[in-house]
Amino acid sequence: MKKYLLLALLPFLYACSNSSNQGINYDEAFAKDTQGLDILTGQFSHNIDRIWGVNELLVASRKDYVKYTDSFYTRSHVSFDEGNIVIETQQDLNRLHNAIVHTLLMGADAKGIDLFASGDVPISSRPFLLGQVVDHQGQHIANQVIASNFATYLIQNKLQTRRLQNGHTVQFVSVPMIANHVEVRARKYLPLIRKAAQRYGIDESLILGIMQTESSFNPYAISYANAIGLMQVVPHTAGRDVFAMKGKGGQPSTRYLYDPANNIDAGVSYLWILQNQYLDGITNPTSKRFAMISAYNSGAGAVLRVFDNDKDTAIYKINQMYPEQVYRILTTVHPSSQARNYLLKVDKAQKKFRVRR
């Protein structure tokens, strides 16, 4: 697990250090900076190992917000998948109080935030977690007064301790999110989703289903494969295709993709490319939707090769099948277990959003 999490750091650290260089050749730059990345990764890992001990490395991911503060002695972890917030420190309770307030009032703008530095995330007048967490009195946490009072309550009434393997003592609080926290986050992005859906002719429920599966509507999302933001757009693959479609050179930067409007537009643009270019020959709309979902995860080429190595023959075979057959093959025969499960998850999520519309 630790090795996997370290791999997740590599592309993110690289992307952060080059976020202003749109149009950069990703492959050449990545190879060129490998030594520097090893140093950065080693430093981060060393800090966490030294302070927290073995098997304690937590880093930001697709559905997890993780932020270290106080020279890495305090950290906040928001699990957008499980709907739980854990804030813990090895320092005094004032540090814990401060971390609780800053976490509850952090904004939705990930563009200028370095999740791998140890500074506080700025307090926002429009907290991203607003409506997803309530305090001990059932109030929404909308400002610093409410957040501070709730932090005091948590420390006085809900404080827990645990012992690390290195002998250090950690004090922490755990805060559950409300039951429908996923839907609350989804609603924040509905105007942008509807705009992109209308512009590119893509079903809103499909966009919502993909976004939930990719990031659980976490605007800070980052993956080990360098997929960024709400729709987990990979700059040097899907991002490059989208820029080419728009007549732009190069690829989107990390900063560009951490803007929710840009990210949703890029993700839906890529769905349009899959629908109208790479998978254009598939005639049944349901079969095409299944192929698009699978291709969003594994690529159109990988999807077509499940049916035949020749693209035209693969499309012909798909067109001879019922949609249910296409679905069964993509969820059982596709060589990637991730892709097989991805179609199952997105299809289920899309159906849920169709019902709720």
UniProtKB/Swiss-Prot annotation:
The EC number(s) this enzyme carries: 4.2.2.n1
A GO BP entry: cell wall macromolecule catabolic process
Lipid linkage positions (N-palmitoyl cysteine): C16
NCBIfam families referenced in this protein's UniProt entry, alphabetically: PRK11671.1 (NF008670)
Protein family (similarity comment): Belongs to the transglycosylase Slt family.
Catalytic activity field: Exolytic cleavage of the (1->4)-beta-glycosidic linkage between N-acetylmuramic acid (MurNAc) and N-acetylglucosamine (GlcNAc) residues in peptidoglycan, from either the reducing or the non-reducing ends of the peptidoglycan chains, with concomitant formation of a 1,6-anhydrobond in the MurNAc residue
Signal peptide boundaries: 1-15
Organism name: Haemophilus influenzae (strain ATCC 51907 / DSM 11121 / KW20 / Rd)
Covalent lipid adducts (S-diacylglycerol cysteine), residues: C16
Cited Pfam families: Mltc_N (PF11873), SLT (PF01464)
Gene Ontology cellular-component terms listed: cell outer membrane
Record's subcellular location: Cell outer membrane
Function: Murein-degrading enzyme. May play a role in recycling of muropeptides during cell elongation and/or cell division.
Record-level Gene Ontology MF annotations: hydrolase activity, acting on glycosyl bonds; peptidoglycan lytic transglycosylase activity
Gene: mltC
Cross-referenced InterPro entries: Lysozyme-like_dom_sf, Murein_transglycosylaseC, Murein_transglycosylaseC_N, Transglyc_AS, Transglycosylase_SLT_dom_1
Protein name (Swiss-Prot/TrEMBL): Membrane-bound lytic murein transglycosylase C
Entry-linked Gene3D superfamilies: 1.10.530.10
Domain of life (superkingdom): Bacteria
Keyword annotations of the record: Cell outer membrane, Cell wall biogenesis/degradation, Lipoprotein, Lyase, Membrane, Palmitate, Signal
Membrane topology category: Lipid-anchor
